[in-house]
Amino acid sequence: MGTLQEKVRRFQKKTITELRDRQNADGSWTFCFEGPIMTNSFFILLLTSLDEGENEKELISSLAAGIHAKQQPDGTFINYPDETRGNLTATVQGYVGMLASGCFHRTEPHMKKAEQFIISHGGLRHVHFMTKWMLAANGLYPWPALYLPLSLMALPPTLPIHFYQFSSYARIHFAPMAVTLNQRFVLINRNISSLHHLDPHMTKNPFTWLRSDAFEERDLTSILLHWKRVFHAPFAFQQLGLQTAKTYMLDRIEKDGTLYSYASATIYMVYSLLSLGVSRYSPIIRRAITGIKSLVTKCNGIPYLENSTSTVWDTALISYALQKNGVTETDGSVTKAADFLLERQHTKIADWSVKNPNSVPGGWGFSNINTNNPDCDDTTAVLKAIPRNHSPAAWERGVSWLLSMQNNDGGFSAFEKNVNHPLIRLLPLESAEDAAVDPSTADLTGRVLHFLGEKVGFTEKHQHIQRAVKWLFEHQEQNGSWYGRWGVCYIYGTWAALTGMHACGVDRKHPGIQKALRWLKSIQNDDGSWGESCKSAEIKTYVPLHRGTIVQTAWALDALLTYENSEHPSVVKGMQYLTDSSSHSADSLAYPAGIGLPKQFYIRYHSYPYVFSLLAVGKYLDSIEKETANET
């Protein structure tokens, strides 16, 4: 019994106790799902444009205060701590949200600083198109001289190009955004008369809405002309597109009134329905507003509008982590969590079935009330959390659905199957390659492999495993790492790939495994920690943070401990850092570890320091026990 082992056991016991104490009566765990200030800003704009200012004064004031609390001393806003020069889109969002609230005024020093930053960076021209859309819907930016091809929505999925070639995330936002844009709808915000002081040269030029980093303007013109030829349609067909878009949205409203349970999509939907003549006082609009309001919470005391809850995800991860640290399957915490999760298994045919028509529903979604949008990541997490014998039929149905979602290339993606059309990837919109398609990713593929190996008992001999492992090695980076799409970033992808392949029996002597282990060890900080910048997701190259984070250190340790023993120097140093109370500073805990959309939406999962630290210390202690047993 060394001092480090004793320290780890104390840490383990403390974390388990904290998690037990935080479990809700219904078996779930609730932690903040904290993203950018965009949601606060957009909801303030919507409420004030709907003349809800007097009725919702307290809510608007708190959301504005939440924005102001995150403003930097120089007046800018940033999406992650080491984005040192300020983020233009985030600063516009913050500035406009505060101004629209009526709680802050242009003459205040912090507002003047934000103005100066925006003006010095070219005004509004280079703001992300989704924020431009929000400004235009509120009469603060001109709609572009461009109509989006809503006729696309009316095309049958049997054609080579159709609406379901876009990712579910893109579709659920594209539909309301396209309707509102094509209707040239404006809901005047009475709290902001104009933003011309930020940009006197606003233009209807559609090229200012498009990505220009990869194309010359002449190339953009040719691409747009190509899309126009593909989707050129008579007026009647365009009207059919409008109606199809409306039906598409209405059919995907959750019981709380939100669209797909996303605050962002719901806000866009409200504008689009208003543009189609739906009354602002109609039940559907009122339920949507109420649903968005239900997502307002406090993250570390700061008012924040979550884009959705993360209840299913958090509950599954925590229950599994507890079980990996000695909490039995029959323990009340585990059984209550299992019952909560079982109630949220999906039972209806939804959009995922377009590309996967022969599978029976059985997956799980991310949020507390999601019934439309299951995903492979949540499904694997839930199936690892629910003991197999707790509900065998539901468990097997989940496994069957998950296996049916394997892509033709052998990998797994987040929401849907085989949604990676090359023409969609080439759309000249910022982040199209990250948001418009849903390709196989190393993190999803690795996490599915981990579940199939650990819980289902699949090995390298199984066809599903062979195809997935082949995909992973084909997509390994030259330096030995893997890129993770939904977490930051190369540490995340490498952790998922290594733990997944180990669970299925891939030998440590494999050159790809050796290369990955060498890479992980090479990026460890001198204090034993690991840390990676969100910048990695933006330039698709590993960028060190030059300081440690608790979550990324836990991922790296978990990965190393799959192939190395507990006495390996990297493991010892890392475990000392992870379990040292001084390491758990605000900076090391608060750094975003999740990615919704690179450059725009980074996520701080408040549950992650608990979950992944616990998994790492549990594996460390298991490793010691196995090594001791082997010695005797």
From Swiss-Prot:
PFTB repeats lie at residues 395-436, 465-505, 513-554. Gene3D superfamilies: 1.50.10.20. Signal peptide: none annotated. It is an enzyme of class 4 (lyase). The active site is at 377 (proton donor). It is found in: Cell membrane. It holds the Pfam family SQHop_cyclase_C. Disruption phenotype: No effect on biofilm formation. CDD domains: SQCY_1. Keywords: Cell membrane, Lyase, Membrane, Repeat. It catalyses: sporulenol = (R)-tetraprenyl-beta-curcumene + H2O. Belongs to the terpene cyclase/mutase family. InterPro entries: SQ_cyclase_C, SQ_cyclase_N, Squalene_cyclase, Terpenoid_cyclase/PrenylTrfase. One of its GO terms (biological process) is triterpenoid biosynthetic process. This is Sporulenol synthase. Catalyzes the cyclization of tetraprenyl beta-curcumene into sporulenol. GO terms for molecular function: intramolecular transferase activity; lyase activity. Pathway: Secondary metabolite biosynthesis; hopanoid biosynthesis. It is a peripheral membrane protein.
